[in-house]
Amino acid sequence: MKLAVVVQRYGAEINGGAELHARYVAEHLARHHEVEVVTTCARDYVTWRNEWPAGEDTINGVRERRFPVRRERDPHDFGRRSQVVFEQPHSVADELAWLESEGPTSPALVRYVASRDAGFDFAFFFSARYYHAWHGARAM
């Protein structure tokens, strides 16, 4: 079975909650299945700046594929949209705009996960609050 573990950041030195959980899941599943981690080139969860090169690598025996983030987070825009979504009546369109503003926004990552060429039988998305999880799950 070919599995995708899709997470906003990935690496041996990334110790965030969802990111570390995703790494543990990927490493465990890779003992029994073909696993590919699909992630962004971002290292910093505040800026989402592209710091790693796009492309493929192997970390702890797990194949990883990185995609660029389209743009860094604008903290003022994100703060304004967060205030609307968390403190005011709002629409689904407002929530989707917040999701885009929060980042990391990587349409190429979403296209890849959903493509027939990738050939995934199943995908695990970490975490639901991010662009790649919402759009990736809907695209599959």
Give residue spans per PLM region.
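Glycosyltransferases and closely related glycan-assembly transferases
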Residues: 1, 107-124, 131-140
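N-terminal subdomain of nucleotide-sugar transferases
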Residues: 1-68
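Short glycine-rich, flexible loops that bind phosphorylated cofactors or substrates
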Residues: 12-13, 73, 131-132
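Active-site-adjacent beta-strand anchor residues
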Residues: 15, 125-126
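A conserved catalytic-core segment of Leloir-type glycosyltransferases
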Residues: 40-117
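Short, well-ordered beta-to-alpha junction loops that form the rim of enzyme active sites
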Residues: 41, 126-129
